[in-house]
């Protein structure tokens, strides 16, 4: 399999916005090169998770090796490395770009360039990839290829004179794409003589073989009889098998520089074979690892609690298993008076959080409650000391701290300019600071804002989509911490603080949020035998309060006429009982109440 010369290898990836037809194009390439037989073909062949097919997004990377006989009658090996298009997974994109020499930039001919595409194109340019613009969906009635070409030139500055028009659905232009890959994407550098280095660009957990690592050999070669060393984790392993993805795994004996393959070596967890790590040989290791390896840091945190306390051990086990295949997921145990035992989890972003939650519920059959998402705050205790906190309920009281700083992001929103006003309104509501506005074309605009991350992680994306009929797209990156007038808003139910409902809000918004929280809880908490006060407080100051009246048993029903003093005695006894109950009683807050309030919190 591997006797092909380096000059005949082409490694490429596909960059596209969600829904611009990347997975369909990948399917079509697999089909046209005869890699996948017609009968085995299914829609979105490379998106292997059910969740990916359902949401129509690519989450985990896949890779496939295709053989293609070009017009010059030479046979080439094309390695397609699939990339996710969503902003949460940008680290997955950056590492797959590192494994390629070229990229197909797929743009929907009826929609134009979107924010995510742009972010990934810049990553590709940083990695010096050859970019081939492809206009997909040219068969649609609304497609305007010329206008979009002009847009690509204006926004990205790419020459589109030899852009390819194609329709992945009907198969138009697929041959041109394959030819362009062969002609325009440079072959890998021939570095077989150098010490072995291979870049891990993906890994997943297989319950039988341990972690399966996808890698690209950068220099030297890997033989299946060797012992390997992972340079970042300093661990060594004996190889069980190495092979290629075609797109099903096929074992081979050896892989050379420039080739893409997989290996299994009984590795226990994905954390040991971190993506971006360098594989080298144990006996003759390389001097230094490949550059650019970063661990992915979580930006969004939330609590995950099982609805049934007995499921806590199952949740622990399933998080451990999920972490085997998702190295960006971080978690630690947490307890809460209201929710019992659970975990505090860190995610790359909101989509990542939703996907982890869905995978836990779907693949491990758990029923979960998720607390409101929060970000990492920097709390300045005094001039010298500061701490970082990801759980709002652990922030120290006002007298123990000087100020709270929150993370800010620089956000770029791309949209048709008729939605300019509504988008500016949305950013203002979310405490955004206006930086700049640029007209890309006559009818498309870029808005640049600096905005607190906490305002973005709740439902900013949904709001932006609904206010612009789905036309806007956005992209953001962290720019640092800033001081703000932030307060910790607590919710007290029967004078006890409900931790999961604690949030950090801006002082100006605190009253409104507190008011709506207590009103919502009043509707949702069932009546008890005693009166329940519900309060929202900042420190020791109550800013909003409601109370749920007690259920009242009619103790006088058996008195008929009777003496007034007898009635008074019974009522007094009832009042005494209620008082004792109020002191002793615990209010069971139903999970629906938490869920509804968390939605409202956003």
Swiss-Prot record:
E.C. code: 3.6.5.n1
Major location category of this protein: membrane
Keywords: Cell inner membrane, Cell membrane, GTP-binding, Hydrolase, Membrane, Nucleotide-binding, Protein biosynthesis
Pfam families tied to this protein: EFG_C (PF00679), GTP_EFTU (PF00009), GTP_EFTU_D2 (PF03144), LepA_C (PF06421)
Binding locations of GTP: 19-24, 136-139
EC supergroup of this enzyme: hydrolase
Protein name: Elongation factor 4
Topological relation to the membrane, as annotated: Peripheral membrane protein
PANTHER family reported for this sequence: TRANSLATION FACTOR GUF1 HOMOLOG, CHLOROPLASTIC, TRANSLATION FACTOR GUF1-RELATED
Keyword Cell inner membrane attributed: yes
GO MF assignments: GTP binding; GTPase activity; ribosome binding
InterPro entries with a match to the protein in the record: EF-4, EFG_III/V, EFG_V-like, EFTu-like_2, G_TR_CS, GUFP, LepA_C_sf, LepA_CTD
Domain of life: Bacteria
Protein family: Belongs to the TRAFAC class translation factor GTPase superfamily. Classic translation factor GTPase family. LepA subfamily.
Subcellular location: Cell inner membrane
Keyword GTP-binding: yes
């Amino acid at each position: 399999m591997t006797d092909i010369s380096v000059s005949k290898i082409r490694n490429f990836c596909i960059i596209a916005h969600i829904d611009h037809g990347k997975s369909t194009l990948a399917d079509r390439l697999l089909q046209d090169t005869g890699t996948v037989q017609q009968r085995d073909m299914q829609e979105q062949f490379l998106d292997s998770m059910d969740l990916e097919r359902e949401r129509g997004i690519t989450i985990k990377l896949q890779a496939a090796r295709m053989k293609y006989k070009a017009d010059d009658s030479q046979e080439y090996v094309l390695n397609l490395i699939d990339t996710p298009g969503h902003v949460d997974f940008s680290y997955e994109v950056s590492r797959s770009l590192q494994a390629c020499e070229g990229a197909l930039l797929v743009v929907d001919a009826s929609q134009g360039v979107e924010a995510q595409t742009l972010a990934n194109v810049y990553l590709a340019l940083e990695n010096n990839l050859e970019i081939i613009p492809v206009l997909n969906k040219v068969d649609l009635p609304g497609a305007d290829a010329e206008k979009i070409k002009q847009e690509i030139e204006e926004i990205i500055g790419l020459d589109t004179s030899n852009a390819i028009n194609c329709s992945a659905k009907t198969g138009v232009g697929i041959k041109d794409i394959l030819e362009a890959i062969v002609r325009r994407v440079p072959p890998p550098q021939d570095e077989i003589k150098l010490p072995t280095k291979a870049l891990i660009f993906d890994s997943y957990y297989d319950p039988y073989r341990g972690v399966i690592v996808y890698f690209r050999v950068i220099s030297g070669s890997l033989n299946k009889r060797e012992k390997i060393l992972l340079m970042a984790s300093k661990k060594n392993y004996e190889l069980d098998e190495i092979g290629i993805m075609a797109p099903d795994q096929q074992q081979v004996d050896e892989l050379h520089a420039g080739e893409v393959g997989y290996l299994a070596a009984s590795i226990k967890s994905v954390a040991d074979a971190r993506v971006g790590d360098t594989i080298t040989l144990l006996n003759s290791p390389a001097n230094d690892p490949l550059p650019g390896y970063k661990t992915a840091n979580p930006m969004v945190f939330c609590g995950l609690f099982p609805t049934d306390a007995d499921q806590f051990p199952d949740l622990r086990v399933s998080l451990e298993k999920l972490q085997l295949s998702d190295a960006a997921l971080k978690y630690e145990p947490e307890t809460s008076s209201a929710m019992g035992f659970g975990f505090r989890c860190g995610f790359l972003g909101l989509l990542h959080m939703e996907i982890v939650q869905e995978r836990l519920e779907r693949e491990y059959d758990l029923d979960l409650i998720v607390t409101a998402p929060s970000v990492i705050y920097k709390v300045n205790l005094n001039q010298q000391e500061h701490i970082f906190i990801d759980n709002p309920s652990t922030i120290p009281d006002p007298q123990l701290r000087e100020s709270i700083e929150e993370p800010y992001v620089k956000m770029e929103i791309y949209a048709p300019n008729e939605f300019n006003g509504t988008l500016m309104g949305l950013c203002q509501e979310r405490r955004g600071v206006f930086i700049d506005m640029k007209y890309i074309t006559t009818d498309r605009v870029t808005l640049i804002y600096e905005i607190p991350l906490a305002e973005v992680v709740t439902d900013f994306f949904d709001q932006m989509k609904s206010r612009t009929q789905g036309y806007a797209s956005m992209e953001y990156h962290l720019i640092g911490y800033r001081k703000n007038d932030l307060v910790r808003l607590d919710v007290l139910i029967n004078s006890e603080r409900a931790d999961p409902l604690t949030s950090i809000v801006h002082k100006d918004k605190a009253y409104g949020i507190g008011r709506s929280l207590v009103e919502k809880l009043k509707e949702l908490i069932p009546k008890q035998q005693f009166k329940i006060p519900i309060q929202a407080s900042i420190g020791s100051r109550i800013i909003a309060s409601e109370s749920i009246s007690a259920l009242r048993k009619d103790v006088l029903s058996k008195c008929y006429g009777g003496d007034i003093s007898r009635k008074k005695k019974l009522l007094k006894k009832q009042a005494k009982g209620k008082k004792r109950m109020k002191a002793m009683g615990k209010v069971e807050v139903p999970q629906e109440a938490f869920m509804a309030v968390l939605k409202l919190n956003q």
